[in-house]
Regions:
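Basic, polar low-complexity surface loops/patches
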Residues: 1-201
Length: 201
């Protein structure tokens, strides 16, 4: 037996976002399948059902209404998860064959914009740290307000001072960066490939 075209598309999209829970738009719902469905159903106390997927066993499945998705995203992000949102990129009524879908948004502690998830008394900073040529480049942004700061420091102590000053919700860094000491701040940390950082020769 072979996977259905829709489930093949789902798994290909999931493969491109392995560190995220995938919310896959199907009509008026975002659906989750397989392991993601098990995790989301448990974390959000949703009913876990199943869907025919072309295999002998049904794929575990759960879903949330698209119009209420922000509340569910807030709850998952507060538990430390990242969520990739795959939207329908064409009208299903006009699509020839399988509806095209693409990930249009990845929601993390530093990129969430839902008002219910943000505090009016505190910025929600996302901090990028790149370590090159024995220096730390630091960029800090609150995408909900547009506040943006950049600086460069030479010493780890100075870097930790910056992390303490901004208290970011999330830090992204290049692989050359050692995260020693940063974990003490209780912040979500992600290491991204060098290609995501503009390295000046």
């Amino acid at each position: 037996m072979a996977l259905s075209p829709m489930m093949t598309q789902y798994l290909e999209t999931k493969k491109e976002n392995p560190d995220c829970l995938l919310f896959y738009r199907l009509g008026d719902f975002y659906e989750m399948f397989f392991e993601d469905a098990k995790i989301v159903s448990q974390e959000l106390e949703l009913t876990l059902t199943g869907k025919d997927c072309g295999l002998e066993e049904r794929a575990p499945m759960c879903g949330v209404p698209y119009h209420a998705v922000e509340g569910y995203l807030t709850r998952l992000v507060s538990k430390g998860y990242k969520v990739a949102i795959a939207e329908q990129m064409e009208d299903p009524k006009l699509a020839k064959g399988l509806v095209k879908r693409e990930v249009v948004r990845i929601v993390t502690p530093g990129t969430i914009t839902s008002e219910s998830a943000l505090s009016i008394d505190k910025n929600n900073y996302l901090m990028g740290i790149v370590y090159l040529f024995d220096r730390f480049g630091i960029a800090t942004v609150d995408i909900s307000t547009g506040d943006f700061y950049v600086t460069e420091v030479n010493e780890t102590r100075e870097l930790l001072d910056e992390v303490h000053r901004f208290a970011p919700a999330e830090i992204i860094c290049n692989p050359s960066f050692s995260m020693s000491g940063i974990g003490d701040f209780g912040v979500t940390i992600s290491s991204l490939d060098h290609q995501y950082f503009n390295e000046v020769e």
